[in-house]
């Protein structure tokens, strides 16, 4: 099988396919762009950090790469509930690329080619191979498209534009035409990136410092990482001001977005600075996070300040910001427009309904973000390889993972703008925490051939430790005097009486370290595992309620819909429901119920019809 593209999606797709034993080739326009970070030099964040943990639990590469190349680590949302805790790290952009390139080079059964793919070979509705710019022809049973923003890429800075992918890469225009000819429903999306500036031109004394978490609190992304972690750099925060906003508004028509040059739809949850100023006119300031791009470079990334305004305007509005008065722009901000597919034309396996054997991943599927891309890449590569090998493919239901939620949203609801994973998109987020991704997904990764012996042994060892400690906490009793002394020492009002450790941990003010101070730490229990156990105990009632809801939803998921089912014959359905059900062709009643425009009464009518049909 073949993977087109070696960005975050392509890396995971190629690695997964080769790990499964499929003879695999990955094609990239440049070996120097493998694992490139064309936007922010970071991994993780709210919901995204959970995706990385899930990817790692399934046997992916991103978590290991982030642990090996991080500069600073922070756990976001620590003041909120565990469902939204999110690990985020600053990474060394160059070292991340080198790690990923080497990881692919070391993957058995994987061939790497520097070549532009200009066409697909399709015969009788099934992919047969690819053609490169140098007229190379390669046959394959399955192909994964992981094209990022290169597909029909067009860069905009003010009224200037040129055909290009990110970071000066070539635009893949010929491949776009080949995909259109094959009948894939393409659309135009847009994203953007801020300027990169020289460290020496920033007055850090006028900015807010944003340090990482204390070293003794740092957690890795990968369940395989045991090495101690240490923060290496600080990040900083600057703020726009009314003068910044005036400069932007005075020049807003020079923005290709507002001047009508850009037709692609931009990301709703990652707007440009000009979008922020226009849409949030009542705000006096917006934060800009100043982040290093690496240890051996002076480039700094200005997160929150992407723009497509002309260079002279960029210079003016950046220099109006306190601490940026002498700013030197090394790379100007730009917007990039690109082609992607309507994801409702994909199966839940990420295989195209139009061209069989063709899979999509990442921004090609209408998503934004490295983490979303990587997670889809693993699933697409896994399923393409299993398809090529004649094995059953993997579909992850929503309740199993954020990855399952993401894919279900894409193929069932579709997207109107670049899709970003958020905790609010999951109705099961209390059970889909980042700390238990291994329990949820590593057995699945093992069953489907991705999880190797070393990871499986580590997983089983961790599960044994957790289970032993659950039993100990269930049985251990804390005497009243011991508990009162521990609570007094912790500055808490002493409890009236002692009790079973597990029951005591249900109280919001009592934490594992306090209990362990009395009965001792469990064998093999780390602070990370202790926090996980405490979360399970404190939220047991809510988790049980979600489990019941999952079982109820699973009933709908088991009600399958025949592929040739005629929705047009069901006069009880609304016209909108009939049209959308016919176009999307849901696999089961559960998926049908999540299609926008399909009402509960439509689902009830469909359920009756399916019962009669069987």
Protein language model regions, located:
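Extended, charge-enriched "interface" segments that sit outside catalytic cores
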Residues: 425, 431, 437, 442-604, ...
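Beta1/beta-strand and adjacent pyrophosphate-binding region of the FAD-binding site
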Residues: 1-9
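Internal hydrophobic alpha-helix adjacent to the cofactor/substrate pocket in enzyme cavities
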Residues: 19, 55, 373-396
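An anion/pyrophosphate-binding glycine-rich loop and adjacent beta-alpha core
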Residues: 30-32, 48, 75, 176-315, ...
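Core beta-strand elements of the Rossmann-like FAD/NAD(P) dinucleotide-binding domain
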Residues: 133-142
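Conserved N-terminal/central alpha/beta ligand/cofactor-binding core
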Residues: 15-123, 134, 146-163, 170-175, ...
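A glycine-rich dinucleotide-binding beta-alpha-beta segment and adjacent secondary-structure elements
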Residues: 301-367, 395-408, 526-580, 585
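Active-site-proximal substrate-binding core of FAD-dependent oxidoreductases
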Residues: 33, 193, 351-354, 385-418
């Amino acid at each position: 099988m073949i993977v087109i593209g070696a960005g975050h999606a392509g890396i995971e797709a190629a690695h997964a396919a080769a790990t499964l034993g499929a003879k695999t080739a990955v094609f990239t326009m440049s070996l120097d762009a493998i694992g490139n970070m064309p936007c922010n030099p970071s991994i993780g964040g709210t919901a995204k950090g959970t995706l990385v943990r899930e990817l790692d639990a399934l046997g992916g590469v991103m978590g290991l790469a982030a642990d090996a190349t991080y500069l600073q680590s922070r756990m976001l949302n620590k003041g909120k509930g565990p469902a939204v805790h999110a690990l985020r790290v600053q990474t060394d952009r160059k070292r991340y690329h080198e790690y990923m390139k080497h990881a692919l080079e070391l993957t058995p059964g994987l061939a790497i080619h520097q070549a532009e793919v200009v066409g697909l070979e399709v015969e009788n509705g099934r992919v047969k191979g690819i053609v490169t710019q140098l007229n190379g022809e390669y046959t394959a049973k399955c192909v994964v498209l992981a094209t990022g923003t290169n597909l029909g890429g067009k860069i905009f800075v003010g009224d200037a534009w040129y055909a290009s992918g990110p970071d000066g890469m070539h635009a893949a225009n010929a491949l776009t035409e080949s995909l259109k000819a094959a009948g894939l429903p393409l659309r135009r999306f847009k994203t953007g990136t801020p300027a990169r500036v020289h460290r020496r031109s920033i007055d850090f004394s006028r900015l807010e410092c944003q340090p990482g978490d204390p070293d003794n609190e740092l957690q890795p992304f990968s369940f395989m990482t045991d090495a101690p972690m240490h923060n290496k750099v600080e990040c900083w925060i600057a703020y726009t001001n009314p003068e910044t906003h005036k400069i932007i508004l005075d020049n807003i028509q020079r923005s290709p977005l507002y001047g009508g040059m850009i037709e692609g739809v931009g990301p709703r949850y990652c707007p440009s600075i000009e979008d922020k100023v226009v849409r949030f006119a009542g705000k006096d300031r917006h934060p800009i996070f100043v982040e290093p791009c690496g240890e051996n470079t002076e480039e700094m990334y200005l997160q929150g300040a992407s723009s497509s305004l002309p260079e002279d305007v960029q210079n003016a509005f950046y220099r109006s910001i306190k601490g940026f008065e002498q700013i030197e722009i090394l790379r100007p901000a730009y917007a990039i427009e690109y082609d992607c597919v309507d994801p409702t034309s994909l199966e839940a396996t990420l295989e195209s309904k139009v061209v069989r054997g063709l899979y999509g991943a990442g921004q090609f599927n209408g998503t934004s973000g490295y983490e979303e891309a990587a997670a889809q890449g693993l699933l697409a590569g896994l399923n393409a390889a299993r398809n090529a090998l004649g094995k059953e493919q993997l579909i992850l239901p929503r309740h199993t993972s954020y990855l399952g939620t993401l894919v279900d949203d894409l193929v069932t609801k579709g997207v109107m703008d670049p899709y970003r994973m958020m905790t609010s998109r999951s109705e099961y987020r209390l059970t889909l925490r980042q700390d238990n991704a291994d329990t949820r997904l590593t057995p699945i990764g093992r069953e489907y051939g991705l999880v190797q012996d070393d990871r499986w042994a580590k997983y089983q060892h961790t599960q044994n430790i957790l289970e032993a400690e659950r039993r100990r906490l269930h049985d251990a009793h804390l005497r009243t005097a011991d508990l009162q002394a521990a609570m007094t020492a912790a500055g808490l009002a002493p409890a009236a009486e002692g009790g079973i450790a597990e029951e005591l941990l249900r109280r919001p003010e009592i934490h594992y370290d306090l209990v362990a101070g009395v009965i001792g730490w469990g064998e093999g229990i780390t602070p990370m595992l202790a926090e996980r156990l405490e979360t399970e105990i404190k939220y047991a009632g809510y988790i049980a309620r979600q489990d019941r809801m999952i079982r109820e939803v699973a009933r709908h998921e088991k009600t399958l819909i025949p592929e040739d089912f005629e929705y047009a014959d069901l006069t009880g359905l609304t016209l909108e429901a009939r049209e959308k059900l016919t176009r999307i062709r849901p696999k089961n009643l559960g998926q049908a119920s999540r299609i926008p425009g399909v009402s509960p009464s439509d689902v009830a009518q469909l359920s009756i019809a399916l019962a009669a049909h069987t």
